[in-house]
């Protein structure tokens, strides 16, 4: 899948654990009803963001990932994340 828009926010790299890093950006989509979409780049894909800045018009190739989580009380919740794997002007 692909998202097109302007970079609204570019966050710093986060060290989530000793073996996992991620960097997030917020992309403002185009169209009649623009959306603010949070896209994660992880591990070796973080370097793809080097050279891009807030305000840049970009196309981002994404995967949508979902997961299930169960609380200690047995409640089940579902989470969705958007992972970027390619970015270009």
How should these model regions be labeled?
Residues 1-89:
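Single-stranded nucleic acid-binding surfaces, predominantly the OB-fold ssDNA-binding core
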């Amino acid at each position: 899948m692909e998202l097109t828009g302007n970079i609204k926010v570019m966050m710093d790299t986060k060290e989530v654990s000793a073996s996992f890093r991620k960097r997030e950006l917020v992309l403002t989509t185009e169209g009649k009803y623009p959306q603010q979409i949070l896209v994660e780049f992880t591990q070796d894909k973080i370097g793809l963001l080097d050279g891009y800045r807030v305000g840049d018009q970009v196309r981002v190739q994404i995967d949508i990932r979902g997961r299930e989580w169960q609380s200690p009380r047995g409640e089940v919740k579902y989470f969705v994340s958007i992972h970027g794997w390619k970015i270009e002007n």
